[in-house]
Amino acid sequence: MEKKGKLELTWVGKYEEEKLEPRILIEDKSKSYGDPNTENMLIHGDNLLALKALEDKYTGKVKCIYIDPPYNTGEAFDEYDDNVEHSIWLQLMKQRMEILNKLLADDGTIFVQLNDEELCYCRVLMDEVFGRNNFINMIAVKTKNSSGASGG
């Protein structure tokens, strides 16, 4: 008997789920700006907890998501540590991607900005979470000229 399976990325701790309690966003009207009748919002805080807070009201309703996760370059910044073991980085991303998938509308699009360090792992993870057939394209941005390039 042939067993059917799927392609997936595995890492230490992948199936250890952290239980997140529902969260409530509290508006700070003193920081509001512009038309008060729009539904736009800026959320300041831990992004995992903020995403969890959005689940109740916005599941299946978000048309466009843009994320710029840590590149895991090995650097240490004041705001965050960009030097974590790859399995930890993948687990952090998996938790967020699963919530983003719930928030995304059927006709929605997600854009992820990464460098080469974790790009391929993120792509396989996203194939697993969003479905490989939902991938549209990868956009490469030239950030500097290669050695010997004319630049033209």
Predicted feature residues:
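A general structural signal for short secondary-structure junctions and capping/turn motifs
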Residues: 1, 33-34, 102, 150-152
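A generic structural micro-environment signature
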Residues: 17, 86, 120, 145-147
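Short, flexible loop/turn elements at secondary-structure junctions
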Residues: 47-49, 71, 116-118, 142-145
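Short secondary-structure boundary/capping segments
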Residues: 59, 79-84, 125-131, 152
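Conserved Class I SAM-dependent methyltransferase catalytic core
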Residues: 86-140
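Class I S-adenosyl-L-methionine
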Residues: 136-152
